[in-house]
Amino acid sequence: MNLVLMGLPGAGKGTQAGKIVEAYGIPHISTGDMFRAAIKEGTPLGLQAKQYMDRGDLVPDEVTIGIVRERLSKEDCQHGFLLDGFPRTVAQAEALETLLSEIGRKLDYVIHIDVRQEVLMERLTGRRICRNCGATYHLVFHPPAKPGVCDKCGGDLYQRPDDNEATVANRLEVNMKQMKPLLDFYEQKGYLRHINGEQEMEKVFADICEVLGGLAR
């Protein structure tokens, strides 16, 4: 089975990706992992990507697509894959369609884990970290026994600047603007399946399995 997994920050994409690859025996392929592997292996495309990344520039689509092609040609992808973090744009999605066609493959589904912005805000702004030992808490989902105090060492809990409301709201807005055209593209192609990501973790996974039920494991 050939899948793309989509969702905004805080939607639980990483958790569900882990469950999918374990249940269906396909590799979880993230953009970052692909780049790191290509750079480590010293492939020509990996070295090109490294030059851009070292300068803090975006890696051009042609290099990214080339690295995706190399990754999908590996033995562990013969029975399927789960792409996460790619494609990010309609141009990349179109290039992926072409690439898959050239190697005799096609996407089965694009799974979108759908969570309302206010729920994402609660999830992302609730994180608190111990200044002393680094333990992580969440005001709603994993609160400390005593507000503002670490259960483990008694240290002071704080909110990272990246987790404040203004920063999180901006991050979600940027991601949504980027993702919307991609969702529309895959909707028109008939690949897109929306999953309610506001449910319990196991129910989200059960709904994903229901979508994938017609595909061979």
Curated annotation (Swiss-Prot):
EC class: transferase
A Gene Ontology cellular-component term: cytoplasm
EC number from the UniProt entry: 2.7.4.3
Main location: cytoplasm
UniProt: Zn(2+) binding residues: 130, 133, 150, 153
Residue positions binding AMP: 31, 36, 57-59, 85-88, 92, 160, 171
Keyword Kinase included in the entry's annotation: yes
Entry annotated with the keyword Ligase: no
Record's keyword terms, sorted: ATP-binding, Cytoplasm, Kinase, Metal-binding, Nucleotide biosynthesis, Nucleotide-binding, Transferase, Zinc
Record-listed ATP binding positions: 10-15, 127, 136-137, 199
GO molecular function terms attached to this record: adenylate kinase activity; ATP binding; zinc ion binding
Pfam families listed in its UniProt record: ADK (PF00406), ADK_lid (PF05191)
Signal peptide annotation: none
Region LID, annotated ranges: 126-163
InterPro entries membership: Adenyl_kin_sub, Adenylat/UMP-CMP_kin, Adenylat_kinase_CS, Adenylate_kinase_lid-dom, P-loop_NTPase
Catalytic reaction list: AMP + ATP = 2 ADP
Free-text comment on this protein's domains from its UniProt entry: Consists of three domains, a large central CORE domain and two small peripheral domains, NMPbind and LID, which undergo movements during catalysis. The LID domain closes over the site of phosphoryl transfer upon ATP binding. Assembling and dissambling the active center during each catalytic cycle provides an effective means to prevent ATP hydrolysis. Some bacteria have evolved a zinc-coordinating structure that stabilizes the LID domain.
Role, per record: Catalyzes the reversible transfer of the terminal phosphate group between ATP and AMP. Plays an important role in cellular energy homeostasis and in adenine nucleotide metabolism.
PANTHER family: NUCLEOTIDE KINASE
The protein's name: Adenylate kinase
Organism field: Geobacillus kaustophilus (strain HTA426)
Gene: adk
